[in-house]
Amino acid sequence: MTDATHRFVFENTDIRGNLATLSGSYRAIVSNQSLPVSLQPLLGEFVAAVALLSETLKYDGILTLQVRGNGPVPLIVADCTNDGDLRGIIELGEHQPLPDYSGLTLPELIGDGVLSLTVDPEHGQRYQGLVPLEGDTLADCLALYFAQSEQLPTKLWLFADQNHCGGLMLQGLPAQQVTDLDQRKEQWQTAVQLANTVTPDELFSLPANDLLYRLFNELGCRLFAAREFRFHCSCNRARGENAISSLGKEEAFALLAEQNGKIAVDCHFCGQHYAFKEEDLQRLFSGSMH
């Protein structure tokens, strides 16, 4: 199974983990964009992270991981539905492209910005957590987010190349199995030290069972059923209609005239094009467009 997450726990500890490996869905996401090769792994890290987090944060709806700033890469977004539908984009905006984006830290790429984690549930209230870009990597920033918001020790290892993305996540839980503070600290440090040895080659080539045995055999690891993921974009014509409607009738028809009788609405996630002509706007603003 090449596009899946695998939850696991360590026996007789209060530590849980999650493993993600994505290939087909990641390649589909990248293929819909004209990204510099040196930026593709960064998008892969965001896609892998949102897949891992989707198993940690229980929700019905959409989980969005986004960073926005004023640097060479002003916007990165990855989102995941509770059904395992993944999307992701990087936007360079008006910035002059760099010859090479590799080797730069996340704050150097984003500039003055903030990382947000948003849950849009199908029912209930929207939730958003914000964290400053105080770590060099996405994994560092997310660890800080969990330390501040959830007050749970959390560590991520994220990897990506042109064909695969994935990662490993460990999280300490409130005391249930083990109450001794020194023992809890020792178990956490051991798990992190073992996870630090993981390599991209292992992550992308070994079955989950084999990888977890290789990394954590001495801790006793229990693996749960895999959860599958795929690329799927939720865009549709109705969203384009809503965007045009939000302009108001006067501004919408002015835009129609500027664009020679056809308003184009493009989805940045999948490249789908939606065109709206005068008769479409007439129906929209008469209340009969569906």
Curated annotation (Swiss-Prot):
Keywords: Chaperone, Cytoplasm, Disulfide bond, Redox-active center, Zinc
Organism: Teredinibacter turnerae (strain ATCC 39867 / T7901)
Function: Redox regulated molecular chaperone. Protects both thermally unfolding and oxidatively damaged proteins from irreversible aggregation. Plays an important role in the bacterial defense system toward oxidative stress.
TM region(s), chain numbering: none
Family statement drawn from the similarity comment of this UniProt entry: Belongs to the HSP33 family.
GO molecular function, one term: unfolded protein binding
Compartment list: Cytoplasm
Family matches, as Gene3D superfamilies: helix hairpin bin (1.10.287.480), Hsp33 domain (3.55.30.10), HSP33 redox switch-like (3.90.1280.10)
Disulfide cysteine pairs (residue numbers): C233-C235, C267-C270
Claim: Zinc is one of the keywords in the record: yes
Recorded superkingdom: Bacteria
Protein name per Swiss-Prot or TrEMBL: 33 kDa chaperonin
InterPro entries in UniProt: Heat_shock_Hsp33, Heat_shock_Hsp33_C, Heat_shock_Hsp33_N, Hsp33_helix_hairpin_bin_dom_sf
Gene Ontology annotations for the cellular component aspect, listed alphabetically: cytoplasm
